């Protein structure tokens, strides 16, 4: 049977999430996580469905993609299909041809597992490598230390506070209480937690959302941020440690995060919270002239 490119629709998102869960492995390269779809769900079910693409053969999903922002496709590929020549050729055709409905003409980026054959084909087509990102992972086999600050699990009643911390942590963020409820209504959030860290004065100083992919699989921190008025006091480390503890309670084998290598402060914060740096990864990109 031929390789099929699909748009799952709102009713098919659960199947895409299930595939992403199955493919998460501590021994494998970092790739799109169900938590990435969960975080995107803040825009609503319809918007998330419109941003997802799947590639399947003989009824089996082999790759899942998320159009995560203008001109960016983030991919996860089944472990036994990352060097599959037929899949790689079809992926390359679909991401390089605007008529296929994946990426528009012009500047574009593809984030794919580092060992995927797709990288070779895109390189042959003239796609270069972009700025490096640093993945970090913390093993959760052993109990996690106390974070040293008060941590609260945010539910519907704390959605306003969680949203306010998000906006105060990220310049340009428009995250609202409504976005939180939209995110929490998605299937991935059944295995997720939002945490809020509080300072000595009782102010909400940092926030993080953690996403489990199921017992024995790596969990994801996305996003983590510290209120701009409370930086430099160790709250980033504290809420990251709390995030690792929450994922361990959810049964995750490890806690994972990825940040631009140029963001040395974030890399240092995660390292201080017991996360180990992994080899840098790079997106493939096409500039506008090649579009």
Task: Name each region found by the language model.
Residues 1-21, 150-163:
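A short beta-loop-alpha structural element at the N-terminal edge
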Residues 108-110, 221, 255-259:
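Conserved hydrophobic beta-strand within the GNAT/NAT acetyltransferase core sheet
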